């Protein structure tokens, strides 16, 4: 096998609290993450007569295709880990392509899930030289969302993330729901978003435990009532289009919530017709709306 194509699933946050700011400036979090069917596609192949060891292309012209891209960095870290694991391992040239569908800078882990898919594809091309724990260790060095995306792209769509979000515990899957993702296009750079919440109270009463309990019993209504995102209080006053998307979704969805640090907003629905109506309402206001489902 010389070519592998992997779906790279988007991430939403069912629960997201910031618990502390460390002396080094990083924040610790408690978050429950869920994969949805909206996805990019990452293709990795071993080309014949390759000139460069790594080549990266992307369908979106605004995505850099060099060493700054997380997919490129994932490939470099994978080869380093494979060589450390087995001294007989020899690097092979790779050509990688990202077909983008996930809105960028929306709190949906688009770059992280592409990197996770690349790690999985490279490992399969290398005959599974690394186990899942080794892949997760690489992922944790690439970014806080990458370990969850590895788990999700391997078939574990719901997980609890602690510390910086990289300490993962697989949770019972969310009951099947319809999802509308609304992208206002305003963008929320992560450092800016975290700077906005430093003055806010960081930990809601009881923390993430009620959400884990709701998932364990498999009750959608209990999940809806326990959804929380600290960033809403900080982001919506600064991103009016995201707030407008939230207002529209709230009129139709069982629950609407900001995803990650924004600016994408998601709505969860038990009724597919209501999800379609919400999509149409968002598009009528000029927002990009994606109809998908939980995994």
Enumerate the predicted regions with their spans.
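Short beta-strand scaffold segments in enzyme catalytic cores
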Residues: 16, 40-44, 145-150, 159, ...
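Generic non-transmembrane alpha-helical segments
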Residues: 74-85, 134, 138-141, 244-252, ...
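Glycine/serine-rich anion-binding loops at beta->alpha junctions
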Residues: 97-126, 144, 255-269
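Short, basic/glycine-rich phosphate-binding loops at helix/coil junctions
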Residues: 50-64, 118, 140, 219-228
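ATP-binding N-lobe of GHMP and related small-molecule kinases
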Residues: 1-106, 124-133, 154, 174, ...
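Contiguous, small/hydrophobic- and glycine-enriched helical/loop subdomains that border
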Residues: 115, 119-163
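Conserved, helical-rich catalytic subdomain that frames metal- and/or nucleotide-binding sites
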Residues: 151-255, 270-273, 279-280, 285-295
């Amino acid at each position: 096998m010389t070519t592998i194509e992997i779906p790279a699933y988007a991430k939403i946050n069912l629960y997201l609290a910031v618990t502390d700011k460390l002396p080094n400036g990083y924040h610790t979090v408690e978050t429950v993450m869920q994969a949805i069917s909206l996805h990019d596609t990452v293709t990795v192949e071993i080309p014949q007569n390759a000139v460069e060891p790594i080549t990266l292309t992307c369908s979106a012209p605004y995505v850099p295709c060099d060493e700054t891209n997380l997919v490129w960095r994932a490939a470099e870290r994978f080869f380093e880990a494979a060589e450390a694991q087995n001294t007989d391992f020899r690097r092979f040239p790779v050509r990688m392509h990202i077909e983008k569908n996930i809105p960028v800078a929306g709190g949906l882990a688009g770059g992280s899930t592409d990197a996770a898919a690349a790690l999985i594809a490279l490992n399969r091309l290398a005959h599974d030289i690394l186990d899942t724990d080794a892949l997760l260790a690489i992922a944790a060095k690439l970014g806080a969302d990458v370990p969850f995306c590895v788990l999700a792209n391997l078939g574990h769509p719901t997980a609890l993330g602690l510390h910086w979000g990289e300490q993962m515990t697989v949770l019972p899957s969310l009951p099947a729901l319809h999802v509308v993702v609304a992208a206002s296009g305003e963008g929320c750079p992560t450092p800016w978003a975290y700077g906005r919440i430093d003055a806010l109270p960081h930990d809601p009463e009881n923390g993430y435990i009620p959400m884990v309990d709701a998932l364990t019993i498999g009750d959608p209504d209990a999940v809806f009532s326990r959804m929380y995102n600290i960033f809403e209080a900080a982001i919506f006053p600064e991103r009016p289009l995201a707030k407008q998307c939230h207002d529209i979704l709230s009129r139709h969805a069982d629950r609407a919530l900001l995803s990650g640090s924004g600016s994408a907003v998601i709505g969860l629905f038990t009724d597919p017709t209501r999800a379609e109506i919400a999509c149409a309402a968002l598009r009528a206001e000029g927002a990009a709306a994606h109809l998908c489902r939980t995994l």
